[in-house]
Amino acid sequence: MGKNVVVLGTQWGDEGKGKIVDLLTDKAKYVVRYQGGHNAGHTLVIDGEKTVLHLIPSGVLRDNVKCLIGNGVVLCPKALMTEITMLEAKGVPVRERLLISDACPLILPYHNALDVAREVARGNKAIGTTGRGIGPAYEDKVARRGLRVGDLFCAETFAAKLKEIVEYHNFSLVNYYKVEPVNYEEVLADALAVADTIKKMTADISEILDQARIAGESIMFEGAQGTLLDIDHGTYPYVTSSNTTAGGVATGCGVGPRHLDYILGITKAYTTRVGSGPFPTELDDEVGNHLGTVGHEFGATTGRERRCGWFDAVAMHRAIQVNSVTGFCLTKLDVLDGLETLKICTGYKTEAGDIITVPPTAAEGYDKITPVYEEMPGWTESTVGATSVDVLPENALAYIKRIEEITGIPVDIISTGPDRVETIIKVNPFL
């Protein structure tokens, strides 16, 4: 029998999910995206060649894998075609490997315009969105006025629905945000120009997954962003607009939650965050600079510099709790090479002097807390490219063991570099 494995981020995104998905897909028949949109940035390095994917599942580079985009993903037609063109230029037959739910909400130019206009209007209270229209597209979905992939396939009906929604959003753009309206005719023409191409790749994703399960195939569900950016469980309001947690798998592609066998939580050996929002262990010193420089901490989607800090076991408590994490994949262990002392945040100290080990539920709760650290010795030896725990420095092994002890979750996979071969697999989730 096959296994259904969920790969998701347990921090604020950028944990290295793309590499791990690509690595493990040699055991999977299907790779499924179930939430988010082209705000994701999954970087794959294979034989030294880097590929950055934003929308298409990371398994697309494997010729034995079918890639599915579930209904929980908001889909930008322009971004999809750009990514297809990029991959085809590399010789990847994307259209043979990709299937898309016709229930995916569409991201159209007015969503981008709204996203950018709102961030500008917020000023120094900006959330730090990618400006790619993700949030406004999810808003339209919840308000039941959004257009979906399936709407593209009837031009007359699509045109009528589009006209109504463009007028609705243009009113806000012009009268409230004082920016230029989007052009209805241009939006219509651009959308219909790719309708036939997209139609050839649409399918009933829920049915495909159910039949695959019955046939005993192995399926991987690829998360985007990270748990602490979840719309419900993250550091609200500094969050994304979808459910990035394991529960999003069931709703985002129509698979029953009872059929999920293993939840692999991807976590860096330290912590990073892009954009605004609470970050208790953030470092503004030489160590923070070391993590950012050695770890190449720049967003794959936006190019923005990531904020860096120590491993936060308190925030991780929430991620483990809401995801039922089975095992960790600890990434970027090699970035810690050369640091004399390492720290793990094991608690937050409140203004009253109490130590809490469960994080606040909203951003405001972080305003008056300070991290409590446990110190450990670092190591001078290189871990870059290690493929066996036997070659890891003693202090690196002690650091990993301490993370396991504090969190209660085993570290089943360790990443020691960007290439898929630079990995230590102690336990393969599919075996």
UniProtKB/Swiss-Prot annotation:
GTP binds at residues 13-19, 41-43, 306, 332-334, 415-417. It is found in: Cytoplasm. It catalyses: IMP + L-aspartate + GTP = N(6)-(1,2-dicarboxyethyl)-AMP + GDP + phosphate + 2 H(+). One of its GO terms (biological process) is IMP metabolic process. The active site is at residues 14, 42. Binds 1 Mg(2+) ion per subunit. CDD domains: AdSS. Mg(2+) binds at residues 14, 41. Homodimer. Belongs to the adenylosuccinate synthetase family. This is Adenylosuccinate synthetase. The gene is purA.
